Every structure is written in C-alpha cells, then in structure tokens.
Design a protein with these regions (language model features):
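Structural motif
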Residues: 5-8, 33, 95-99, 144-146, ...
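A generic structural motif
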Residues: 69-73, 115-128, 170-171, 243
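Extracytoplasmic/periplasmic, Sec-exported soluble proteins
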Residues: 22, 32-37, 45, 96-100, ...
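Periplasmic binding protein-like
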Residues: 3-5, 115-160
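Ligand-site clamp/hinge motif
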Residues: 1-13
C-alpha cells in the first residue's frame, strides 16, 4: 500500500519516510461438514502455506507478505497431512473485497484443480459480510480483518459480532464459542485474559477453521523535510513524532 502526503505540485519531489507491515490480514475460514473433514481442511491450508502460492501472488511488487502468525506470537500450525487424504471433488469459495482476493481466489482455484478438486468461486462485491445469503452455500470464505490499537480486543469482537461466524460453525459450536468468550472476558487479570484469547484462536487454527493468508506492506512518502510520519495498525496517520527541519536563515 503506497500512501503519499503532499500537495499536487509537491508530488514530483516526494520520497519514502516510513514503511512497515500492517497487523491487519486477509483470512480464510473453512466450514467443517460432511463435505469437508478436519484433515481435508488441513490439507487445503497446508497447500496454501507450503506450496509457495502466497509468495507468488501477482498483486503488485512488495504489496503483501505471506502471514506466519495471526498476531505476533500467535503462529500458524503446520501438519504432516497423510498421503491418503484426498480433497472433495467440489468445493465452493465465497469471498469479499479487497481486490487482492480476486487473484488469491483464482490461484487457489487452479491449485486445488491440480489436486482433483473443482473450486466454484462466488464474489460478494462488498467490504464486509453485510449480506450473508451467499454464505449458506460456502465451504470456504475469504475476507480481511483490520486490526485496531487493541489487537486482542479487536479479534475478540470479531468473533462475537461478525455475521460470518454463525455460518462457519453449527449452532452448538457457535454457542460454545460465545460462552468461551464470555468466560475469557470476565478474567480479571489482563495477561491471563489475553493468553486465554490466544488459546481460543490457536484452537481455531489447529482445527483448520481459520488461517491468516497475508498482511500488507505499507510505504508512506512525503515531500522533503517531512519526517517521523507513520501509520497505526488501524490505518490512521500518526503525527506525534513528525517533525520539520528548522527554516534556514
């Protein structure tokens, strides 16, 4: 993501003043059912993370980086998938924006076809799951998750409030998830609360219900003399450390 600060007449003179990797990520969720078993779901995730698919997406130079963790320290599990595990003959993927997921969906479709699985792709032209009608038919779902200044709180609220999750879990599993989050929320010690929430997400990843796909690189450019501008994890500009050189005498 390239962000440029300055007036139109200054754009020819801008240079990079800050860069980094956003905590926000694009994700894949997988609904386990008679159509998709635990090990079949793990195989899909293993193919994505171990085949080089993410590293070779054609979405612009240095725009994304493959995810290795949901948050720093919340690492993605890896499995040795037995050779006898075969993918279903057909699966359905539903996804929404950002546009980088168009490329991801097409590459995943081609990659799974090589494994004997025909992936039907359905695009929901929105930035969120404002309409969940299409999710009724989905085995796989892709979208993105922005991360705020309090990453753990942001992810906890994602599980609680996003209309995606009732379509990922059956009713008993979704109710159990919500009761688990209730128990986590009332823990008085913040460190224990964060560790318990990490355990919830680690289990979702171990169960092949959720995996992060990639994070975004960002680069901020500004005219000469502008320094110390950075982007917060939520995507806001942070100017508290910005400075300009003293005017020349």
């Amino acid at each position: 993501m390239q962000i440029t600060i300055g007036k139109p007449e200054e754009l020819q003179r801008v240079s990079q003043v800050s860069s980094g990797i956003s905590l926000g990520f694009c994700y894949l969720t997988l609904r386990k059912s008679p159509r998709l078993s635990l090990w079949q779901a793990r195989k899909v995730i293993s193919i994505i993370h171990q085949s080089g698919l993410l590293q070779t997406l054609e979405v612009g130079e240095n725009l994304i980086t493959a995810s290795h963790a949901l948050l720093p320290g919340w690492t993605i599990p890896h499995w040795q998938v037995p050779d006898e595990v075969k993918l279903p003959k057909t699966l359905t993927l539903v996804y929404h924006l950002p546009i980088e997921l168009h490329t991801m969906a097409e590459r995943l479709q081609a990659t799974l076809a090589a494994e004997g699985c025909e992936l039907t792709i359905i695009f929901h032209n929105a930035k969120n799951w404002d309409d969940t009608t299409l999710l009724v038919h989905a085995d796989l779902m892709m979208g993105d998750r922005l991360i705020g200044e309090a990453p753990e709180y942001t992810l906890e609220q994602w599980l609680r409030c996003d209309p995606l999750w009732p379509h990922v879990f059956d009713a008993p599993a979704y109710a159990h998830l919500q009761s688990t989050l209730d128990a986590v929320q009332v823990m008085p010690d913040e460190e224990n609360r964060f560790n318990a929430l990490k355990a919830v997400f680690s289990q979702l990843m171990a169960d092949a219900t959720l995996t992060p796909l990639f994070n975004y690189h960002y680069r901020i450019s500004a005219p000469p003399g502008v320094n110390g501008v950075r982007l917060t994890p939520r995507g806001w500009f942070e100017f508290t450390e910005a400075w300009l050189p003293a005017p020349s005498q």
